[in-house]
């Protein structure tokens, strides 16, 4: 039987960390105490104007490919999860394919599921590999969310950051990705959205992120707990067999509440929201790569990754690393 396992991870954060006090100095009506007490966020990274999602994705991808011990030309599938693509089209994945110098070698496409995008992309790639149609996939979450923030809205602009994370997923006789679960409920779309588009050369509607924070919190805590239990039950394993939980890094309170629902201590949770802020589809692979490189996540350990994003969309994956 063909399985899909993670062979390498990589990540990239642009520039220097931007603190809450830095935002205050830029004229944002907030304070370090206000942001930290409500979200746990202390810093985030903001890409310069000439850097797009494909640029961030390129560095993260190169690092993941190097960690996997393969060459770029060995990749025959690229899936990029992003809500902030470089262009309306072509896809960021095809731009990344070109920047990697891969050329005509397999498929490349984007997935848009906002903050759960990486879990969606990972699940899709795993299915491609298990089918036998592809052997080595590059799965990337990359975002420049700073481009869609209303910097006069202190309730949202302090929450988000830019970055990219990537994994190389390859065919293996040894199980890696054990189970995945994906869900969506579009009836909740007004709670978290960017309700605008481009038509006839003009921005139609509102081009900035809008969010009902309390509604997002309640929904996220419920579905993240549910979907984590779903992948554990599907694999027939208990929560106490999990070595690490890597949730979407939106808010430390959501992360703490999710861990509590699973009966896991925070010592088993990889939390980077304090350093990275909410990087949407990039948050999970960023946290994963950090924990791999600092030695917390080691071969043979069991990891749950999970995310929830606008739509709403949500999902989880159980992985033997």
Curated annotation (Swiss-Prot):
ACP-binding: annotated span: 249-253
Pathway(s) of this molecule: Lipid metabolism; fatty acid biosynthesis
Where does the UniProt entry say this protein principally localizes?
A: cytoplasm
PANTHER family in the cross-refs: 3-OXOACYL-[ACYL-CARRIER-PROTEIN] SYNTHASE, BETA-KETOACYL-[ACYL-CARRIER-PROTEIN] SYNTHASE III, CHLOROPLASTIC
On assembly, the entry states: Homodimer.
Please give the catalytic activity noted in the UniProt record: malonyl-[ACP] + acetyl-CoA + H(+) = 3-oxobutanoyl-[ACP] + CO2 + CoA
Task: Give the EC number(s) under which this enzyme is classified.
Answer: 2.3.1.180
What taxonomic lineage is listed for the species of origin? Bacteria, Pseudomonadati, Pseudomonadota, Betaproteobacteria, Rhodocyclales
Catalytic machinery residues = 115, 248, 278
**Full protein name:** Beta-ketoacyl-[acyl-carrier-protein] synthase III
User: What does the entry give for GO biological process?
Assistant: fatty acid biosynthetic process
| Transmembrane spans | none
Any Gene Ontology CC annotation? cytoplasm
Q: What is known of its domains?
A: The last Arg residue of the ACP-binding site is essential for the weak association between ACP/AcpP and FabH.
Checking Pfam families in the record gives: ACP_syn_III, ACP_syn_III_C
Q: Any keyword Magnesium? A: no
Top-level taxon in the UniProt lineage: Bacteria
Instruction: Indicate yes or no for the key word Transmembrane helix.
Output: no
Q: By its UniProt entry, which InterPro entries does this protein fall under?
A: ACP_syn_III_C (IPR013747), ACP_syn_III_N (IPR013751), FabH (IPR004655), Thiolase-like (IPR016039)
Which keywords label this protein? Acyltransferase, Cytoplasm, Fatty acid biosynthesis, Fatty acid metabolism, Lipid biosynthesis, Lipid metabolism, Multifunctional enzyme, Transferase
Instruction: Supply the source organism for this entry.
Output: Azoarcus sp. (strain BH72)
Q: Where in the cell is it found?
A: Cytoplasm
Q: What class of enzyme is it?
A: transferase
Q: Which HAMAP family match?
A: FabH
What is the annotated role of this protein in its UniProt record? Catalyzes the condensation reaction of fatty acid synthesis by the addition to an acyl acceptor of two carbons from malonyl-ACP. Catalyzes the first condensation reaction which initiates fatty acid synthesis and may therefore play a role in governing the total rate of fatty acid production. Possesses both acetoacetyl-ACP synthase and acetyl transacylase activities. Its substrate specificity determines the biosynthesis of branched-chain and/or straight-chain of fatty acids.
So what family is this one in? Belongs to the thiolase-like superfamily. FabH family.
